[in-house]
Amino acid sequence: MNNLLNILTDHKKKYEIFELLENLYKSISLSKLKNTKIKTHNLDSYSNLESSNFDVVLFHSKVIKPTIINYQDITKSFDLNNVNYDEILDANLNYLLRSYKVNKIFLFSNISIDKINNEKLVLIKIDINNDKLMYERTLTMHSFVNSNLFKNNTCFIDTDVFINFEELNIFSKNFDIALTHRTKQTFMPINEGVILVKKNGISNAKEFFRNYMNIYSFICRSNYVKNFYGNNIYIWRGGQLSLNLLVYNKGSIFKDYENFYVDKNLILILPSFNYNFTPKAQTTYSLSYLRKKSIIHYKGHKLKKIFSNFKSIYF
């Protein structure tokens, strides 16, 4: 009986994310969302050329001290310091470098990549405050679209996101920015791990990411957020929450391939089932099944541990 009560309580907490989104959206709509002064990364020393191929933007930070992620809508807390992103980042970089459909890979990081020497990989060394980890990630995207590097169709992805470019026939569709949504109602609807941006609307994309940053700064001061998540969403959750507020629409219940406008950008909503698929740790998948997915997201600390089981897809 107690176990059932715990499960119901856990699900209730997760469903409350929709109430939080609604309350925050109303507070943002009613307030004058000021343009926060944002200090972007100076990327003038880097260059890029126009190409029919994709650019990929990644963000990676070395976390040294114990960093516990524990929010009420996360089933089990975990320590970022115990999650090995190095192996999955290395596999992803080597996989991307072999693709003839990739123009450049821009890696924003505070580490060195000495063992990879390839002109397609551009390492952008930056100082990263790990106490504001997800804020720093959002800042890199904002900096990129406001630099001379943003010249091509661009995939902003987490380091644990693998793109099957043979199946990613998406940039021919009508949109400016494509996002993926999850239908399971205990998760935040839009996942920030996959953001696809077309090059045709550069000025509008700048506005989109500027407001992304503005909302982030605003909600960090919100009592709604502090009551739900505590005092620090700079380190985790803040980026995803800000993105969901930016595209908040009809209660955030989205349809597959739905279109609507945000900041003059035509948004396309893609199903996570194909474009942000997360394998379940307890489920067995055939390689042919996984190879048909356009984008696979090895999300969660459990999946990092079993990633070696899926390596043969990419090598």
Residue positions per predicted region:
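N-terminal anchoring/stem segment of glycosyltransferases
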Residues: 3-130, 146-150, 199-200
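Short, surface-exposed beta-edge/turn micro-motifs
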Residues: 54, 103, 175, 191-192, ...
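Short, solvent-exposed loop/turn segments at secondary-structure junctions
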Residues: 61-65, 112-114, 161-163, 183-186, ...
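A structural signal for well-ordered alpha-helical segments within the folded catalytic domains
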Residues: 87-90, 135, 139, 237-245
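Short, hydrophobic beta-strand segments that form beta-sheet elements in well-ordered domains
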Residues: 101-111, 153-160, 178-179, 296
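GT-A fold catalytic core of metal-dependent nucleotide-sugar glycosyltransferases
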Residues: 123, 133-202
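Catalytic core and acceptor-binding pocket of nucleotide-sugar-dependent glycosyltransferases
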Residues: 203-310
